[in-house]
């Protein structure tokens, strides 16, 4: 063992050992309890960032810990390799996206290996490889045959920059989640998967997920948005047509004075054929949707156009004018594109009615029985009140009236109960090149067929062709630009391929299952292997995926279950959502007013006495503005390159800091001083063990002859095992686990080391510490374990077990003072009197040097805590 700790010397050696011996490769073993630990699959963007490092370090700590418990641990890794960034890079560099993607994978793989993660690299997946997406295409054809897939022309979210459709979940503040371009609404043919068929299962399944963060479950419940209501059918005057509208609140039904429909509602489109005003209104307000969403609807002018068509109120038989309105969005109106209007009790409806001189009819008094004043605004929403102006329902409470009105409507044959969902079917068509081709063809007679199994996979055309730019400068590189590829055959008949590709969330919705059998060629999954490993025991990823990936992840699992591929109802038992990694951010303002963000590593900082930043300058001497701790990002240029930090401090120090600096679900503030502190601690461990070994061989530990000080050390060692085990396993409080280990190391530095049993106790303690540290800092632990004489490699060592005898509470630690100064500590039986404690001190002979030539005048004793001997 070398005298000095040098991570660059040991880490590569240990990593080569793991790679050569395939230490972490696993197979199914029915004789061992399995444990499947998985961090969310990374996108090969070109470089790991510290968010990646935090995510994968957490997974590795848990995996190594579970392995030490004797479990058969699967921890795989792969690459979610399709997507727009690769396509954009290819366009920019005039190359094929596969070249960019595989180059990035090779580099990022080397980064992961340099951090020492215990992956089974034999199971590495790359989702853009045909061997992977072949089965995704096959499964799509299975769902199509089951009726769970359909194609329709629909109003969709359209990103004009990327020239592709976005799912509802991919729209943030009415902008594309990637490029932040305002989203437009467009009607185009799209493939959908019926996720709404599984809405109740997805909702009720959340109750099984007792080890998922409550915040994630709340977000999914809200996104699914189950509501109970009534579908009410309104007859159209002088027509056999009807208009059906979903309602959740019926006590205000008698206050309906007009109806509104969206600009693409069939009634609106029909009227537009003969009414130029309506036609012009529809055309004019198409762009309105680019500005509108649920959050800002109140800040835009509400506009409408009468259709001169009337619906009939089912109870009063009064005529209700139907208006085309710019604030009715089909996907926001439960897919019906129509809504009732009760202007007396809804501010948006009131504003519209006031503007166009439509009737306003109040029908609910508050519980004080005062009629609402609606001259200036609608009545504030009330959950309860008394009906008036409502005919036969006058005088009823809101609750009673709701039930009575529903019964009346049902009796008239114009209403039925309906459970509705905010969740909409998953639109999976994307109009880009770099994705999985949708395996459908259209015959010359217009019949659509799924591609046959023996013709799968449908592979992308080789090499992206000439870049196509539209008049507005946006790139259109969808598969429709590849005419030779589009032409194909189906059972000898001429056919054309579908030119859309799958939403990339498809690939990331089932990768976890394919990890269980990545080289299996006979089916999508090897059912035996999949159901040995599944469900995932521990899944790790950011909470930002709550209503996208994590919802599709659960949905896809249920689809595979219903195909008999997996047996469990949910894909993952436990979910951990780690916090973001934050770093200092600095900028200056350029002459043209732009914020120019400066790499923190190029900044010189002056701090005040409490550590606050009071001045910052860049390498050119320019004064900078400090923007605080922000999420590491390219946009603020405050990311930290893991390679530089690993080279400087070592992978173990990085891993230690990542796990120690903050509770795992909280944001982590990146500070290089914290990495320095982690490395100092590892050096202390190394030095402690080095000097212990230099002192020569160690006798066997004999617990029956230990003195009080030695027992005290063992007590601390085994209490630390107990705490660290609970912190890692149950609480997942990794920072407090490391804190406990650090406290124990400090105690060992001060422990007696003179006698052979002193050294035997220390040997036991050091072997424990190295094993406790192994999940966090595996490289240094590997070397120190061997140096201490540990049997085999530490990779095969077991987690330390608490010696319950060592931590029994029949003894207590009493502090010993001479004239008020701390001189010693002694273990004494609980509740001993001062004579017993003093006798123990006499037996140990530790007081003699302090009492020579002195007379004891008094002994002050606080039971179980302190004894103070007063001597002169």
Curated annotation (Swiss-Prot):
Location of the protein in the cell: Cytoplasm
Class of this enzyme: ligase
E.C. designation(s): 6.1.1.4
Source organism superkingdom: Bacteria
Name of the protein this chain belongs to: Leucine--tRNA ligase
Motif ('KMSKS' region): 631-635
Record key words, sorted: Aminoacyl-tRNA synthetase, ATP-binding, Cytoplasm, Ligase, Nucleotide-binding, Protein biosynthesis
Motif window: 'HIGH' region: 42-52
Reaction catalysed by this enzyme: tRNA(Leu) + L-leucine + ATP = L-leucyl-tRNA(Leu) + AMP + diphosphate
Family to which this protein belongs: Belongs to the class-I aminoacyl-tRNA synthetase family.
Main location class: cytoplasm
Keyword match ATP-binding: yes
UniProt source species: Blochmanniella pennsylvanica (strain BPEN)
Binding residues annotated for ATP, in chain numbering: 634
Cellular-component GO terms for this entry: cytosol
GO molecular function annotation: aminoacyl-tRNA deacylase activity; ATP binding; leucine-tRNA ligase activity
UniProt-listed InterPro entries: aa-tRNA-synth_I_CS, aa-tRNA-synth_Ia, Leu-tRNA-ligase, Leu_tRNA-synth_edit, M/V/L/I-tRNA-synth_anticd-bd, Methionyl/Leucyl_tRNA_Synth, Rossmann-like_a/b/a_fold, tRNAsynth_Ia_anticodon-bd
GO biological process: leucyl-tRNA aminoacylation
């Amino acid at each position: 063992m070398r005298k000095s700790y040098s991570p660059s010397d040991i880490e590569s050696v240990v990593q080569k050992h793991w790679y050569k011996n395939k230490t972490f490769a696993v197979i199914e073993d029915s004789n061992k309890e399995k444990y499947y630990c998985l961090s969310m699959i990374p996108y090969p963007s070109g470089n790991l960032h510290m968010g990646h490092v935090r995510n994968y370090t957490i997974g590795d700590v848990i995996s190594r810990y579970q392995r030490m418990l004797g479990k058969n641990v699967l921890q795989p890794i792969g690459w979610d390799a399709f997507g727009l960034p690769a396509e954009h890079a290819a366009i920019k560099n005039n190359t094929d996206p596969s070249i960019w993607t595989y180059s990035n994978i090779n580099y990022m793989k080397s980064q992961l290996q340099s951090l020492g993660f215990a992956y089974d690299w034999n199971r590495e997946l790359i989702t853009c490889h045909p061997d992977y997406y072949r089965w995704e295409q096959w499964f799509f054809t299975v769902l199509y045959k089951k009726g769970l897939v359909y194609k329709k022309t629909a109003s969709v979210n359209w990103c004009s920059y990327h020239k592709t459709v976005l799912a509802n979940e991919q729209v943030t503040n009415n902008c594309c989640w990637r490029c932040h371009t305002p989203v437009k609404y467009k009607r185009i043919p799209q493939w959908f998967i019926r996720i709404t068929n599984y809405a109740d299962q997805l909702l009720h399944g959340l109750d099984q997920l007792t080890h998922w963060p409550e915040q994630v479950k709340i977000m999914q419940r809200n996104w699914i948005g189950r509501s109970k209501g009534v579908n009410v059918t309104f007859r159209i005057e002088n027509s056999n047509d009807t208009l059906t509208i979903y309602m959740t609140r019926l006590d205000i039904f008698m206050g309906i004075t007009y109806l509104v429909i969206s600009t693409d509602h069939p009634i609106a489109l029909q009227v537009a054929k003969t009414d130029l005003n309506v036609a012009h209104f529809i055309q004019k307000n198409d762009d309105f949707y680019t500005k509108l969403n649920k959050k800002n609807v109140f800040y835009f002018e509400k506009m409408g156009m009468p259709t001169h068509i009337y619906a009939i109120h089912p109870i009063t038989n009064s005529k209700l004018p139907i208006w085309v309105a710019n604030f009715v969005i089909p996907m926001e109106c439960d897919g019906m594109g129509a809504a009732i209007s009760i202007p007396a009790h809804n501010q948006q409806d009131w504003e519209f009615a006031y503007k166009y001189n439509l009737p306003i009819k109040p029908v609910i008094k508050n519980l004080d029985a005062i009629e609402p004043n609606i001259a200036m605004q609608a009545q504030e929403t009330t959950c309860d009140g008394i009906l008036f102006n409502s005919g036969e329902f006058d005088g009823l409470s809101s609750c009673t009236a709701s039930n009575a009105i529903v019964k009346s409507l049902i009796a008239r044959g114009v209403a039925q109960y309906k459970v509705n969902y905010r969740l909409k079917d998953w639109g999976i068509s994307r109009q880009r090149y770099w994705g999985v081709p949708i395996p459908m063809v259209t015959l010359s007679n217009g019949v659509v067929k799924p591609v046959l199994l023996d013709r799968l996979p449908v592979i992308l055309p080789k090499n992206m062709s000439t870049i196509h730019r539209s008049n507005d400068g946006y790139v259109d590189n969808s598969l429709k630009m590849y005419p030779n590829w589009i032409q194909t055959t189906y059972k000898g008949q001429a056919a054309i391929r579908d030119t859309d590709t799958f939403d990339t969330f498809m690939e990331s919705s089932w990768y976890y299952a394919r990890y269980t059998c990545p080289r299996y060629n006979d089916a999508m999954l090897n059912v035996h292997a999949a159901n040995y490993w599944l469900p995932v025991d521990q899944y790790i990823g950011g909470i930002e995926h709550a209503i996208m990936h994590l919802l599709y992840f659960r949905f896809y699992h249920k689809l595979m279950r219903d195909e008999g591929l997996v047996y469990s109802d949910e894909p993952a038992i436990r979910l951990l959502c780690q916090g973001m990694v934050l770093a200092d951010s600095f900028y200056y303002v350029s002459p043209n007013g732009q914020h120019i963000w400066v790499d923190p590593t190029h900044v010189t900082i002056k701090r005040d006495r409490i550590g606050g930043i009071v001045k910052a300058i860049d390498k050119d001497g320019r004064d900078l503005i400090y923007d605080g701790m922000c999420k590491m990002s390219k946009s603020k240029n405050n990311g930290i390159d893991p390679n530089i930090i690993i080279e400087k401090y070592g992978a173990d120090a990085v891993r230690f800091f990542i796990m120690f600096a903050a509770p795992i679900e909280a944001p982590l503030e990146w500070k290089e001083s914290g990495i320095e502190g982690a490395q100092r601690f590892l050096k202390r461990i190394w030095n402690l063990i080095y000097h212990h070994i230099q002192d020569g061989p160690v006798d066997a530990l004999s617990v029956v002859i230990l003195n009080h000080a030695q027992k005290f050390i063992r007590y601390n060692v085994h209490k630390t095992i107990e705490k660290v085990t609970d912190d890692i396993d149950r609480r997942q409080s990794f920072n407090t686990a490391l804190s406990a280990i650090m406290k124990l190391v400090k105690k060992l530095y001060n422990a007696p080391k003179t006698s052979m049993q002193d050294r035997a106790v220390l040997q036991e303690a050091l072997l424990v510490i190295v094993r406790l540290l192994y999940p966090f800092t595996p490289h240094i632990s590997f070397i120190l374990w061997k140096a201490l004489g540990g049997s085999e490699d530490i990779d095969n060592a077991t987690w330390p077990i608490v010696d319950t005898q060592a931590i029994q509470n029949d003894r207590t630690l009493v502090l010993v003072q001479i004239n008020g100064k701390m001189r010693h500590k002694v273990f004494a039986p609980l509740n001993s009197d001062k004579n017993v404690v003093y006798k123990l001190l006499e037996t140990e002979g530790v007081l003699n040097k302090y009492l020579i030539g002195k007379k004891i005048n008094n002994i002050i004793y606080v039971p179980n805590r302190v004894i103070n001997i007063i001597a002169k």
